Amino acid sequence: MLVFKGKLKEHPRWEVENELYRFRNRVFSDRLGWDVESHRGLEQDSFDTPDTHWVLIEDEEGLCGCIRLLSCAQDYMLPSIFPTALAGEAPPRSSDVWELTRLAIDANRAPRMGNGVSELTCVIFREVYAFARAKGIRELVAVVSLPVERIFRRLGLPIERLGHRQAVDLGAVRGVGIRFHLDERFARAVGHPMQGEYADARELVTE
């Protein structure tokens, strides 16, 4: 499998942008039934800009995993779309705090680890950790459904709920705002050996 982290305009294949929006539409609109902005089979919103950073995973069938990274020094989803998930906390507005959104995987396209979590999830967060270390990011935040929160805990990611820590209504699901601690616990959680092979997409050579 090929792994990419960065801006879409830096990806070696220009087609990946529409592939990403189609993949997101299949996951968030078709499979989960979320109320998202979808047009002609593409799910895209105002946070998708040329400067948005991504982690992407693809195999011979196409994209099978993604996550979006947004700096909290700029407009981001938690205070704009899901303010109740802040649970009474003030929204971070710092360049060393980033938000994770649009996490999606096709779990059937990779092995599962001993804890039952798909390798794709672990690889995505391994790349997120590397990105955060390189950028001097000290903390990550996200809004997640309760099932996704449980997956993160099974993986061993060091997370805590924001504010009053109670689940809130996110529309189609109930969920929480969470904070990730970027410490040695995070590094251990994503440091498991993998059965699959994951190479850097930037090293992809086209004939």
Swiss-Prot record:
**Cited function:** Required for the synthesis of N-butanoyl-L-homoserine lactone (BHL), an autoinducer molecule which binds to AsaR.
Domain of life, per lineage: Bacteria
Pfam families the UniProt entry points to: Autoind_synth (PF00765)
Assigned EC number:
2.3.1.184
Output this protein's name: Acyl-homoserine-lactone synthase
Molecular-function GO terms, alphabetical: N-acyl homoserine lactone synthase activity
**Keyword hit for Chloroplast:** no
Name the protein family.
Answer: Belongs to the autoinducer synthase family.
Ribosomal protein is among the record's keywords: no
Reaction it catalyzes: a fatty acyl-[ACP] + S-adenosyl-L-methionine = an N-acyl-L-homoserine lactone + S-methyl-5'-thioadenosine + holo-[ACP] + H(+)
Entry's Gene Ontology BP terms: quorum sensing; signal transduction
Give the species this sequence originates from. Aeromonas salmonicida
Q: Which Gene3D superfamilies match?
A: 3.40.630.30
Membrane spanning segments where?
none
Sorted alphabetically, which PANTHER family does this protein's record hold? ACYL-HOMOSERINE-LACTONE SYNTHASE (PTHR39322), ISOVALERYL-HOMOSERINE LACTONE SYNTHASE (PTHR39322:SF1)
**InterPro entries from the UniProt entry:** Acyl_CoA_acyltransferase, Autoind_synth_CS, Autoind_synthase
Q: Which UniProt keywords apply?
A: Autoinducer synthesis, Quorum sensing, S-adenosyl-L-methionine, Transferase
